[in-house]
Amino acid sequence: MEEETHTDAKIRAENGTGSSPRGPGCSLRHFACEQNLLSRPDGSASFLQGDTSVLAGVYGPAEVKVSKEIFNKATLEVILRPKIGLPGVAEKSRERLIRNTCEAVVLGTLHPRTSITVVLQVVSDAGSLLACCLNAACMALVDAGVPMRALFCGVACALDSDGTLVLDPTSKQEKEARAVLTFALDSVERKLLMSSTKGLYSDTEQCLAAAQAASQHVFRFYRESLQRRYSKS
Amino acid sequence: MAEPASVAAESLAGSRARAARTVLGQVVLPGEELLLPEQEDAEGPGGAVERPLSLNARACSRVRVVCGPGLRRCGDRLLVTKCGRLRHKEPGSGSGGGVYWVDSQQKRYVPVKGDHVIGIVTAKSGDIFKVDVGGSEPASLSYLSFEGATKRNRPNVQVGDLIYGQFVVANKDMEPEMVCIDSCGRANGMGVIGQDGLLFKVTLGLIRKLLAPDCEIIQEVGKLYPLEIVFGMNGRIWVKAKTIQQTLILANILEACEHMTSDQRKQIFSRLAES
């Protein structure tokens, strides 16, 4: 028997007023998160953003090979498996981005000479994949009880050819966009942990500000989801 | 730009540190900062309250608060590092502000000094047994750490045996070491666990619940069948009853206990008692 906490939340982030032109598609898609759904890993989570779904499992702090051990902190490994085919260079680069984000947040010095492994499986990809992976990784790390100094979330935004900013773009919006930016933000002061950008753009500040506003909703969703999980015990 | 700044300010306002007292029993998330009792007055509403300087400069009365699992000291505040419910225990006697800790649900065990755990012997190298306790490293157990063991009189421990012992050394920097005697040299229930029986794994939170004083589950289970049971703080439980069927029933009940309410449990127990 497994404890499943299925939390649905329809989050809308309306950034109506402001000097920058904002289109009507400025809301985050429907979120859902489920924790502790896998029995083998120490922590697991499934995060759904619209139609994009990622399943994450965390093992740790566990044994580490002597060749990979670090004497004063935990070795963090991220494995990202695409939905079809073998993992390629794109997956490797995403793994590195996610790993750098996790390393900034996880208190690795509490578990030296151990390994913390995050395994992500893409279940369906309909845009904002990196952001969804970051969210799933964060929820899985919390589920596993890995000590962290803050929570983090991923927010993706796409810049149209006429400068319209769309948060949480679908794959169609990503393809037609001039630039796609993904930010990882921490929960304490909404600081920027990681940014991955592709395309032509000139104004990072505006996108970052919009992402910071949207991250508020994501963190609120995290809080509600975790409160619901602990209220059942 | 004015707009993003106001949005940012609003989001930051929610993350101001709260007093630990007000958050007791609530779910706290990693990254939250908690104020200890003696700092609440200093912070105050707004924080910019003028206080008359007292000529009698008394050293601020510091209460010694113990920071338990899930909390870290961050300056003079507590930083929450795990998600769970915040708990507090008043000090029994003497000074001190008690213990604060976060009650979280976890599956992975991290060795802690003084914990009694069930381990599986994985290797025997010279005078040391390597025991798997479910942590990141196997613990070491010396053959002299059994009751009545001497160099001539070695304990009969084979690879694959179950050991119930406690940690004497368990910190993040060293390999954990366990022993099967207490400080007086007596076994006190520790040592090799006998033949038969079933070892299974549950979450750490369930073990703590079962080991709490006045746990109803254990009393009810004891009334069902005569049984032997050993709880390891590393999430492992060993049960043995008269027949294999009874042992399996007990194992299933204990595993399911985590998700059942007390009414459902009572129903199942009454149904089993009848059959």
Curated annotation (Swiss-Prot), chain B:
Position of the Glycyl lysine isopeptide (Lys-Gly) (interchain with G-Cter in SUMO2) cross-link: 151
UniProt subunit comment: Component of the RNA exosome core complex (Exo-9), composed of EXOSC1, EXOSC2, EXOSC3, EXOSC4, EXOSC5, EXOSC6, EXOSC7, EXOSC8 and EXOSC9; within the complex interacts with EXOSC5 and EXOSC9. The catalytically inactive RNA exosome core complex (Exo-9) associates with the catalytic subunit EXOSC10/RRP6. Exo-9 may associate with DIS3 to form the nucleolar exosome complex, or DIS3L to form the cytoplasmic exosome complex. Exo-9 is formed by a hexameric base ring consisting of the heterodimers EXOSC4-EXOSC9, EXOSC5-EXOSC8 and EXOSC6-EXOSC7, and a cap ring consisting of EXOSC1, EXOSC2 and EXOSC3.
A GO biological-process term: positive regulation of isotype switching
Domain of life from the UniProt record: Eukaryota
Disulfide bonds: none
Modified residues (N-acetylalanine): 2
Protein name as annotated: Exosome complex component RRP40
A GO term, aspect molecular function: RNA binding
Keywords attached to this entry: Acetylation, Cytoplasm, Disease variant, Exosome, Isopeptide bond, Neurodegeneration, Nucleus, RNA-binding, rRNA processing, Ubl conjugation
Main subcellular location: cytoplasm
Compartment list: Cytoplasm; Nucleus, Nucleolus; Nucleus
Disease listed for this protein: Pontocerebellar hypoplasia 1B: A severe autosomal recessive neurologic disorder characterized by a combination of cerebellar and spinal motor neuron degeneration beginning at birth. There is diffuse muscle weakness, progressive microcephaly, global developmental delay, and brainstem involvement.
UniProt xrefs under PANTHER family: EXOSOME COMPLEX COMPONENT RRP40 (PTHR21321:SF1), PNAS-3 RELATED (PTHR21321)
One of the Pfam families matching this protein, by short name: RRP40_S1
Chain coiled-coil ranges: none
Organism: Homo sapiens (Human)
TM region positions: none
Family stated for the protein in its record: Belongs to the RRP40 family.
GO cellular component terms, A-Z: cytoplasm; cytoplasmic exosome (RNase complex); cytosol; euchromatin; exosome (RNase complex); nuclear exosome (RNase complex); nucleolar exosome (RNase complex); nucleolus
Stated role: Non-catalytic component of the RNA exosome complex which has 3'->5' exoribonuclease activity and participates in a multitude of cellular RNA processing and degradation events. In the nucleus, the RNA exosome complex is involved in proper maturation of stable RNA species such as rRNA, snRNA and snoRNA, in the elimination of RNA processing by-products and non-coding 'pervasive' transcripts, such as antisense RNA species and promoter-upstream transcripts (PROMPTs), and of mRNAs with processing defects, thereby limiting or excluding their export to the cytoplasm.
Annotated InterPro entries: Exosome_RNA_bind1/RRP40/RRP4, KH_dom_type_1, KH_dom_type_1_sf, NA-bd_OB-fold, RRP40_KH-I, RRP40_N, Rrp40_S1
Keyword Ubl conjugation: yes
